[in-house]
């Protein structure tokens, strides 16, 4: 994740059970270790002041300035998924055992306020719950509701005139195909990656178009909260990648979207889609940056953050190296990268890796056969990390 002002990036450390926040300008990293090996750590959103939210077992706030992680409640009681650019508002959910999806909430100074959920009658389909994912400074909230087909149609909440209560607006209702018998052209679902621009104007959506033959194609959409219009870019519009999938992960205040094409579980190629322009891979949009082609070749290039002004982009990728680590027969590992689109040398930089983070100790083919050091086969490769965890990559 990247803060709207471009100063901070945050995520998880590969090769160890910890989260991190990195100050791009000061070149300083703060890590937040999990209390034990079985505890999951995730950073889901970060504000301009270096305060991030996510979970470290229970819901958690990660503060760059104090270098402290503060947890709230018990594990699985609360979930923090987004924070406003000014760091004052947090969105997520609370769980009391009555709703599998939880109750969407706005947290203001640690106090949860339940967000209303639209009725099944209004939705035209049965809802199993809802979730809030991101929030702007003026309390516009984006998220989704969950239907019987387990998709996640997009949903907005906006404050009422009293400034305290909210109304739900399922803007995807006019585009959502609730079944394969539906005459609606699109099934708009937002998944966990969907976020809103810092100014609350745009929402990036992942889209599945149902085809007449019973199949589907995937694309990305840009929703304008001010005029209720949706723009689409489908995978079929990409030459040579018609059968791939598109996933948008972040959007700037001017509607620029970054994400990846390929698949969440196979080869990923980073893309940028500026408003009024054609979607391009990062390697096409910035041909002087050789690193982007290298990251694409690694099969895991995933731009996942963009600053509010669209200048700074951050992501992660798998990168090969020519030499193996002394305690590994394999080369390469995961890297977190950040890029200034106006930087005069048109180069891309990597965040400093934690000691041992992202190291790959062995590689296996899809059928479980161990590969020789440095060798690769087409298709899925399974990587064994130094900490015992595994990760899939896809080689073209």
Model-flagged regions — what are they?
Residues 347-396:
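C-terminal outer-membrane/trafficking sorting elements
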